[in-house]
């Protein structure tokens, strides 16, 4: 009986007859031979249908197939040195499963809004396939890294009655007889987890009602948020750089084909696996920007132009340390050497991609944290449980958050975050 395989496993079946369930992405014909470009969700390769080797009805069907028709292909696997994938199938039989009429995304160029309107179909393209393969690998590597480091996965709630970074930019919803919010971050809950289990990480969706149309913003995205008890900032920075280097190395090891489809140079990515990453302070960053003629001063937050410039100055990801209190959230630890700034850091990705990680050591003192919550204009009652963590065995602890789509955008060298998630949500995009 002919074995059913996936395209990605073709190398293990050279000169064997196999059966593959596939979709047609494109085709071309040269008289007595029809070339079928096939995909099955694991890879892409070519099917060759020769008029001399198949029944007339099979050759006629091959010539009539429409883009995105689904079928069973039976044939013999051969090596194909002309393609990067390296293999093709000599077709012996075609069984049509599902026809496709007037597929809207033809091989011609389409505008971005058209493609986003048809995102459910755009995902089938080679480029989107490659991006999602790399996204999958980075999620897999995330779990592997933190499991190896002794962390446990913790799942924070999505519906909350409080916000870790203030009540602006929140999506509000009715929750029976009260208001609830879609979570901006799982960090506060991860801190509770760290006090219980030592080292935890979260991986899930978060929501920001930011009315921003930049290439770096989505209203729904995924965050990886580790939290570590008995951990100071220096130790956290080392975990952060090891984690990012691990992600990049995992993509290099396991995603050569997707990287090729994206024309992403592996040699460039390799330099991001070298540790340690450089560090500068916020004050040094301000001076660098001012020396470059940019209109910034101490106390300003960095936007895309500033982050792009700073990250362009380094060949690796770079940490920017110790931001002023006025531009960071209330829960961070005050710098013992400068009470106007926090013990915190952002990691900026090179090639102009900007922030991919934000992290800090957390405030451990009950009264100091209580005052910070009040100073931020937040309701103490909503944070009573969070303050409890400082009443019952408070310890030094640190954590950080990596924006998954930002990291994917950098690793894949994309122009916009919208391609880094299957169905992007933006200020003007809620479907499909």
Curated annotation (Swiss-Prot):
One of its GO terms (molecular function) is catalytic activity, acting on a protein. Its EC number is 6.1.1.22. Keywords: Aminoacyl-tRNA synthetase, ATP-binding, Cytoplasm, Ligase, Nucleotide-binding, Protein biosynthesis. The keyword Ribosomal protein does not apply. Pfam families: tRNA-synt_2, tRNA_anti-codon. SUPFAM superfamilies: Class II aaRS and biotin synthetases, Nucleic acid-binding proteins. It is an enzyme of class 6 (ligase). The keyword Cytoplasm applies. GO terms for cellular component: cytoplasm. It is found in: Cytoplasm. Belongs to the class-II aminoacyl-tRNA synthetase family. NCBIfam families: asnS, PRK03932.1. Homodimer. HAMAP family: Asn_tRNA_synth. This is Asparagine--tRNA ligase. It comes from Lacticaseibacillus paracasei (strain ATCC 334 / BCRC 17002 / CCUG 31169 / CIP 107868 / KCTC 3260 / NRRL B-441). The gene is asnS.
């Amino acid at each position: 009986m002919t074995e059913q395989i996936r395209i990605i496993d073709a190398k293990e079946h050279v000169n064997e007859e196999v059966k593959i369930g596939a979709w047609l992405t494109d085709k071309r014909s040269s008289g007595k031979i029809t070339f079928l470009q096939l995909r099955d969700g694991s890879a892409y390769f070519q099917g060759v249908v020769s008029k001399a080797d198949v029944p007339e009805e099979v050759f006629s069907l091959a010539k009539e197939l429409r883009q995105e028709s689904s079928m069973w292909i039976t044939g013999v696997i051969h090596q194909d040195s002309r393609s990067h994938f390296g293999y093709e199938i000599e077709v012996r039989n075609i069984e049509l499963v599902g026809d496709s009429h007037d597929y809207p995304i033809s091989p011609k160029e389409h505008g971005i809004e058209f493609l986003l309107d048809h995102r459910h179909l755009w995902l089938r393209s080679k480029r989107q396939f490659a991006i999602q393969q790399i996204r999958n690998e980075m999620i897999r590597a995330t779990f592997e890294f933190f499991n190896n480091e002794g962390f446990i996965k913790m799942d924070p709630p999505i519906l909350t009655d409080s916000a870790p970074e203030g009540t602006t930019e929140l999506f509000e919803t009715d929750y029976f007889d009260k208001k609830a919010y879609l979570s901006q971050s799982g960090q506060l809950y991860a801190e509770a987890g760290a006090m219980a289990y030592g080292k935890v990480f979260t991986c899930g969706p978060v929501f920001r009602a930011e009315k921003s149309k930049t290439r770096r913003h989505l209203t729904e995205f995924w965050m990886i948020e580790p939290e570590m008890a008995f951990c100071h900032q220096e130790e956290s920075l080392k975990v952060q750089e090891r984690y990012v280097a691990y992600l990049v190395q995992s993509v290099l090891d396991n995603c050569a084909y997707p990287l090729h489809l994206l024309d992403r140079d592996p040699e460039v990515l390799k330099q991001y696996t070298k540790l340690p990453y450089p560090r500068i302070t916020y004050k040094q960053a301000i001076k660098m920007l001012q020396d470059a003629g940019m209109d910034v001063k101490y106390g300003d937050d960095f936007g895309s132009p500033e982050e792009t410039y700073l990250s362009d100055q380094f060949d690796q990801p770079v940490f920017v340390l110790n931001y002023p209190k006025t531009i960071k959230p209330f829960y961070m630890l005050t710098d013992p050497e400068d009470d106007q700034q926090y013990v915190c850091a952002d990691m900026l990705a090179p090639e102009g991609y900007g922030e991919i990680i934000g992290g800090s050591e957390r405030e451990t003192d009950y009264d100091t944290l209580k005052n910070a919550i009040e100073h931020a204009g937040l309701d103490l009652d909503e944070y009573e449980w969070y303050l409890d963590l400082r009443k019952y065995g408070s310890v030094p602890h640190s954590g950080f958050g990596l924006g998954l789509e930002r990291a994917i955008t950098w690793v894949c060298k994309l122009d916009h975050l919208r391609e880094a998630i299957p169905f992007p949500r933006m200020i003007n995009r809620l479907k499909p």
